[in-house]
Amino acid sequence: MQPTPFSSLSSADGCWTGLRLAQGLFIPDVAVPDDALSCVVVQGGTVRWVGPVAAVPPAFAALPRHAGGGALATPGLVDCHTHLVYGGHRANEFAMRLAGASYEEVARAGGGIVSSVKATRAASEDELFAQALPRLQALLDEGVCAIEIKSGYGLALEHERKQLRAARRLGEACGVTVRTTFLGAHALPPEYAGRSQDYIDLVCREMLPALAEEGLVDAVDVFCERIAFSLAETEQVFQAAQALGLPVKLHAEQLSDMDGARLAARYGALSCDHIEHLSAEGIAAMKAAGTVAVLLPGAYYTLRDTHLPPIQALREAGVPMAVSTDHNPGTSPALSLRLMANMACTLFRLTVPEALAGITTHAARALGLQDTHGLIAAGRPADFVLWPFAEAAELAYWFGHQPPQAIVRQGRVVQR
């Protein structure tokens, strides 16, 4: 049977032959000799078998064949922390930071998150969808097959709702797994200046229950920091999420050690994100809770931060480390997850295997998707990417425009 060109495929069903798989990194419990090419068998949009080409079971002999030509195969990439839906942009703040303004100084001058709140409130749901679509498409074109999208630029029920609705629509329109996170406790809206407890009460008693009832919330996040919300206020939001059966995550220890990681771990948080100022006690708590450390080198780079996350301590403790774009209009206008992998290696000194696990396996865990995403394995949905690279290290080594050869997402070949 002659192989079918990728450009003429719609369904991914068949035997994807002649692939090179990075052993020990992407494919669990499959032994493939280093010099052997592999095969991924897809039926009904699900991976049915993975192994050496020479050992494909006879039961799959009649399936169409798709020749990989020695391409490197990886799981679909997972971007586990983004603020993709928002109005406007904040390019003016770039100049402020270049002139020496700190993150906190920009925020106190009326910029930062509150600036995006004004633009987001002024936009309709359709406008937010239209603005976010090309951002999402840029990430998908690079092989992202699952993504988190947070709210947090509405800071009022109607505006948080339209952000989350736009996020759901993006997933449906693009055929990609989108996990929505309610980040109502992102910043104090201007109309609640000096009344943070009143706003937290609104978040916990009205906004979160209403949005959860509408099926718009997969997880709940808080920005716990001196310029945002206190530890006590964060816990109130976590308690409200717990009462609704929703998992939590946290913007933790980005600018200072607020002891947020230990609090998040007590609530079994999926992840703690940023964590530049994470303490030894926080690391121990995260390890015990199985909480993922999400590294955001794009924000670190944009803010010209110099306080590195405690990578070696996380490594020694065995805390899984994910890497994400943190795409947002102010501190990380990044639209390349592979560039973030490169930055995680270059700036944070992750090893290449750590960085690649960080944008696949561990990123999936940070979203609660560890049973369906982040690995190529029998029984999982067919989400994988073929690359024109000789070895896996090239995924983090190259940066710039290096498009995949083929993308399989939700069991279908993506035509670009």
Curated annotation (Swiss-Prot):
Which Gene Ontology CC terms are recorded?
Answer: cytoplasm
Question: Which InterPro entries does the record associate with it?
Answer: Amidohydro-rel, HutI, Metal-dep_hydrolase_composite, Metal_Hydrolase
Q: Copy the pathway line from the protein's UniProt record.
A: Amino-acid degradation; L-histidine degradation into L-glutamate; N-formimidoyl-L-glutamate from L-histidine: step 3/3
Q: How is the cofactor bound?
A: Binds 1 zinc or iron ion per subunit.
Q: Which UniProt keywords apply?
A: Cytoplasm, Histidine metabolism, Hydrolase, Iron, Metal-binding, Zinc
Q: Which GO terms describe its biological process?
A: L-histidine catabolic process to glutamate and formamide; L-histidine catabolic process to glutamate and formate
The entry marks the following residues as binding Fe(3+), namely: 81, 83, 251, 326
Please give the catalytic activity noted in the UniProt record: 4-imidazolone-5-propanoate + H2O = N-formimidoyl-L-glutamate
Which residues make up the binding site for Zn(2+)? Answer: 81, 83, 251, 326
The lineage's top-level taxon is: Bacteria
Which residues are involved in binding 4-imidazolone-5-propanoate?
90, 153, 186, 254, 331
- Binding residues for N-formimidoyl-L-glutamate, per the UniProt record? 153, 328, 330
Q: What is its EC number?
A: 3.5.2.7
| GO molecular function, a single term | zinc ion binding
Annotated compartments: Cytoplasm
Signal peptide position in this chain?
none
Q: What is its main location?
A: cytoplasm
Task: Quote the CDD domains the UniProt record gives.
Answer: Imidazolone-5PH (cd01296)
- List, separated by semicolons, the cofactors it needs: Zn(2+); Fe(3+)
Report the function annotation for this chain: Catalyzes the hydrolytic cleavage of the carbon-nitrogen bond in imidazolone-5-propanoate to yield N-formimidoyl-L-glutamate. It is the third step in the universal histidine degradation pathway.
UniProt similarity note: Belongs to the metallo-dependent hydrolases superfamily. HutI family.
| The protein's name | Imidazolonepropionase
Q: In which organism is this protein found?
A: Paracidovorax citrulli (strain AAC00-1)
Q: What is the lineage of its organism?
A: Bacteria, Pseudomonadati, Pseudomonadota, Betaproteobacteria, Burkholderiales
